[in-house]
């Protein structure tokens, strides 16, 4: 993916196995939809419907891509929705506010390697098993970083190894996860 800002919705369907998106520095996928925004039928888009990028396919790989939801502080606004199994993100950026990264697939295993993830509230959330290795996780304000919905009986949910948790100076109370 060439350097540039691409304002669009990207969908990687389940049938497209082993897709790779490798970006030049500065490759940004962005959109500004949000959960309470009305669609063409006058219905709210919902959290899932607000995403900039949807990844349903297994064995997806992304490198040097920025996934952004630029809606601002308007409630839930997903940058990347990941449902496919064995998704691997290397040196990617996930930018948003509330609900930035949706690790959706209950049986999905996801790996985030040297990624940057930012948001305000519950900005990493969902059901998947996800490993975050050497990532920077940046809070833009007070709130919870993660809101996992790990099924009881699953061995792992979210695992963080060698990650840095950072935040804006104004943030007074930031918690790793909801109780």
Where are these regions (language model features)?
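Sequence-level preference for short, compositionally simple segments enriched
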Residues: 2-179
